[in-house]
Design a protein with these regions (language model features):
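Conserved donor-binding/catalytic core segment of Leloir-type glycosyltransferases
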Residues: 8, 162, 189-191, 198-217, ...
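Glycosyltransferase donor-sugar binding loop
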Residues: 45-49, 210, 234-251, 267
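Nucleotide-activated donor-binding/catalytic signature segment of Leloir-type glycosyltransferases, i.e.
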Residues: 70, 247-269
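Membrane-proximal helix-turn-helix segments that form the acceptor-binding/catalytic region
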Residues: 143-161
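Aromatic "clamp/platform" in nucleotide-sugar-dependent glycosyltransferases that forms part
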Residues: 289
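Short hydrophobic beta-strand element within catalytic cores of glycosyltransferases
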Residues: 306-310
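Conserved acidic donor-binding segment of nucleotide-sugar-dependent glycosyltransferases
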Residues: 325-333, 340-347
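A charged, aromatic-enriched C-terminal amphipathic alpha-helix characteristic of glycosyltransferases
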Residues: 347-378
């Protein structure tokens, strides 16, 4: 029996964490698909985003096995240069997969180790959307300095960047040069579920928004649109409040909404419960400024929920397949029109869009040939 190649995945957060959203799902799905062909080692932190306490009932600072994957949950005291280097040398990975752009321990240290010849593994860096112009505009001074330092040390030329779409690949080459090695492959989505039925009554609409409360996710845009929608509308916001100032602005809009519009905030909801909440709503809405994949979008589609999103994600041409709408944020009136259209749908009309959403997700799974593409990247 041949020995499986080893992939050591560095990520700040992993299950049972959920507050970091998409990056966690990217790593979980990656491990689930790739563990049949590779020995997967996940090196991660021992607590969720923003938490001061470690996960309950999780062994820390030692390798444990779960679902065919090796996991190491490092406490803050175990995160240092010497300890990380020891783990890399003990594992002797063939490949190192980095899942953040700016993390000190989970990205910068491994990059420097590669630069100075302390590790020989092939290094693949997934920026996870952090190089999009809409993301770089936050704290631009520090990020510009960091990019210049990487180029000064010639680190981009010694690794491979994993871009999840053509836009992200263009962002990478714009920052680090056309010659920088890149590979464009979409993220692994979650395994497809059966279509989840829900009844739709004309004049009534249940909307769900999931993600972080942060300007990039653009919740305030959705709330402004709801001001102009007639009918009985329920919006459930499933989110972690990351930007308190932005949330205060959103609350002001919520308090000014007309009476038929109801809004509920559900904070810090574990991933498995988010799936159940998506199933209990008619329409998934995310007017995001930019997503490099959008796991929650795909999860909604795969459950048979049409989506109303911006045109700043990989999920495009939705309307022609009756899966949803991907609209420019410059056209707020069109967002309002679609919300009103869906609110007015009866069950027969809605089920056509529900089936279209589910089929869109199925077509993606059948046509993408993702696993073979990843095996090319890790070769």
């Amino acid at each position: 029996m041949s020995v499986q190649p080893k992939i050591m995945v560095f990520t700040d957060w992993y299950e049972p964490g959920f507050k970091a959203g998409g990056p966690i799902r990217s790593c979980v799905n990656f491990a689930a698909y790739m563990k049949e062909d590779y020995a997967i080692y996940i090196f991660t932190g021992d607590r969720d985003l923003g938490d001061k306490q470690a996960y309950l009932q999780i062994e820390t600072n030692r390798w444990i096995e779960k679902d065919g994957v090796q996991l190491f949950y490092a406490s803050p005291g175990a995160l240092n240069w010497e300890s990380i280097l020891v783990h890399v040398r003990d594992i002797k990975p063939d490949y190192i997969y980095l899942n953040n752009m700016y993390s000190k321990y989970f990205t910068i240290y491994p990059l420097l180790m590669k630069r100075f010849g302390l590790i020989t593994a092939k290094v693949i860096l997934a920026p996870r959307g952090m190089l999009k112009s809409t993301a770089v505009q936050y704290k631009p001074g520090k990020k510009k300095f960091f990019f210049q330092l990487l180029k000064l040390l010639n680190i981009p030329g010694r690794i491979v960047f994993h871009a999840t779409d053509s836009t992200e690949e263009a962002d990478i080459k714009n920052l680090f040069g056309e010659a920088v090695p890149t590979k464009q492959i979409s993220n692994f989505p979650p395994m497809q579920k059966d279509l989840q039925p829900i009844y739709k009554e004309s004049g009534s609409l249940k909307i769900i928004f999931t993600g972080r409360v942060h300007p990039i996710k653009n919740l305030a845009f959705l709330l402004r649109c709801l001001h102009l929608v007639a009918g009985s509308v329920m919006l459930t916001i499933v989110a972690t409040i990351e930007d308190e100032g932005y949330w205060l602005k959103c609350r002001e809009i919520i308090e000014s909404l007309p009476q038929p519009i109801a809004v509920e905030l559900r904070q810090d909801v574990p991933h498995q419960e988010i799936e159940e909440l998506i199933n209990a709503h008619h329409l998934f809405v995310l007017p995001t400024l930019g997503e490099n994949f959008g796991h929650a979008i795909f999860e909604a589609l795969s459950a048979g929920r049409p989506v109303l999103i911006s045109d700043q994600t990989p999920w495009r041409s939705l309307q022609e397949q009756h899966a949803g709408w991907d609209l420019p944020l410059s056209n707020e009136k069109e967002f309002v029109r679609v919300l009103q259209e869906v609110a007015g749908m009866d069950d027969e009309a809605f089920q056509q869009w529900s089936a279209g959403a589910w089929q869109y997700a199925r077509n993606f799974m059948e046509s993408s040939n993702l696993k073979e593409k990843y095996k090319e990247l890790f070769s």
